[in-house]
Structures are given as structure tokens and as C-alpha cells.
Amino acid sequence: YLDHGLGAPAPYVDPLEPKREVCELNPDCDELADQMGFQEAYRRFYGTT
């Protein structure tokens, strides 16, 4: 028996995605993220992730 009403499960949601988007909108944070990674760049601009 297949339940066709539910479809595929929802993809995993990254809890840091909203912060990643904030960093991407700041050109300086985005550039730093390319060099050292998003979490370190975000920490330097906005504090802890």
C-alpha cells in the first residue's frame, strides 16, 4: 500500500540558513565567507552563530 497523498519527505532544513542569507546580503561578509567559511565570517561581523 502506497500513500500517494504525502509525496516525498521534506528536505533537511539547515538551521543556519537565515544567518547564511544575512551574510550573503552583506558584500564584505560574503567575501570573507568565500575565504574562511560562512560561520567564521558571520561570527566576525555579527557575533556568535
Swiss-Prot record:
<dbReference type="GO" id="GO:0005509">
    <property type="term" value="F:calcium ion binding"/>
</dbReference>
<comment type="similarity">
    <text>Belongs to the osteocalcin/matrix Gla protein family.</text>
</comment>
<dbReference type="GO" id="GO:0046848">
    <property type="term" value="F:hydroxyapatite binding"/>
</dbReference>
<feature type="disulfide bond">
    <location>
        <begin position="23"/>
        <end position="29"/>
    </location>
</feature>
<keyword id="KW-0379">Hydroxylation</keyword>
<keyword id="KW-0479">Metal-binding</keyword>
<dbReference type="GO" id="GO:0030500">
    <property type="term" value="P:regulation of bone mineralization"/>
</dbReference>
<dbReference type="GO" id="GO:0007420">
    <property type="term" value="P:brain development"/>
</dbReference>
<dbReference type="GO" id="GO:0008147">
    <property type="term" value="F:structural constituent of bone"/>
</dbReference>
<keyword id="KW-1015">Disulfide bond</keyword>
<dbReference type="GO" id="GO:0001649">
    <property type="term" value="P:osteoblast differentiation"/>
</dbReference>
<dbReference type="InterPro" id="IPR000294">
    <property type="entry name" value="GLA_domain"/>
</dbReference>
<feature type="modified residue" description="4-carboxyglutamate">
    <location>
        <position position="24"/>
    </location>
</feature>
<dbReference type="GO" id="GO:0032571">
    <property type="term" value="P:response to vitamin K"/>
</dbReference>
<dbReference type="InterPro" id="IPR035972">
    <property type="entry name" value="GLA-like_dom_SF"/>
</dbReference>
<dbReference type="GO" id="GO:0042593">
    <property type="term" value="P:glucose homeostasis"/>
</dbReference>
<dbReference type="InterPro" id="IPR002384">
    <property type="entry name" value="Osteocalcin/MGP"/>
</dbReference>
<dbReference type="GO" id="GO:0032869">
    <property type="term" value="P:cellular response to insulin stimulus"/>
</dbReference>
<feature type="modified residue" description="4-carboxyglutamate">
    <location>
        <position position="17"/>
    </location>
</feature>
<dbReference type="InterPro" id="IPR039176">
    <property type="entry name" value="Osteocalcin"/>
</dbReference>
<comment type="function">
    <text>The carboxylated form is one of the main organic components of the bone matrix, which constitutes 1-2% of the total bone protein: it acts as a negative regulator of bone formation and is required to limit bone formation without impairing bone resorption or mineralization. The carboxylated form binds strongly to apatite and calcium.</text>
</comment>
<dbReference type="GO" id="GO:0005737">
    <property type="term" value="C:cytoplasm"/>
</dbReference>
<dbReference type="GO" id="GO:1903011">
    <property type="term" value="P:negative regulation of bone development"/>
</dbReference>
<dbReference type="GO" id="GO:0050890">
    <property type="term" value="P:cognition"/>
</dbReference>
<feature type="binding site">
    <location>
        <position position="30"/>
    </location>
    <ligand>
        <name>Ca(2+) 3</name>
    </ligand>
</feature>
<feature type="binding site">
    <location>
        <position position="24"/>
    </location>
    <ligand>
        <name>Ca(2+) 2</name>
    </ligand>
</feature>
<keyword id="KW-0964">Secreted</keyword>
<feature type="binding site">
    <location>
        <position position="21"/>
    </location>
    <ligand>
        <name>Ca(2+) 2</name>
    </ligand>
</feature>
<protein>
    <recommendedName>
        <fullName>Osteocalcin</fullName>
    </recommendedName>
</protein>
<dbReference type="GO" id="GO:0005576">
    <property type="term" value="C:extracellular region"/>
</dbReference>
<feature type="modified residue" description="4-carboxyglutamate">
    <location>
        <position position="21"/>
    </location>
</feature>
<keyword id="KW-0372">Hormone</keyword>
<dbReference type="GO" id="GO:0007611">
    <property type="term" value="P:learning or memory"/>
</dbReference>
<keyword id="KW-0091">Biomineralization</keyword>
<dbReference type="GO" id="GO:2000224">
    <property type="term" value="P:regulation of testosterone biosynthetic process"/>
</dbReference>
<dbReference type="GO" id="GO:0005179">
    <property type="term" value="F:hormone activity"/>
</dbReference>
<keyword id="KW-0301">Gamma-carboxyglutamic acid</keyword>
<dbReference type="GO" id="GO:0060348">
    <property type="term" value="P:bone development"/>
</dbReference>
<feature type="binding site">
    <location>
        <position position="17"/>
    </location>
    <ligand>
        <name>Ca(2+) 1</name>
    </ligand>
</feature>
<dbReference type="GO" id="GO:1900076">
    <property type="term" value="P:regulation of cellular response to insulin stimulus"/>
</dbReference>
<keyword id="KW-0106">Calcium</keyword>
<feature type="binding site">
    <location>
        <position position="24"/>
    </location>
    <ligand>
        <name>Ca(2+) 3</name>
    </ligand>
</feature>
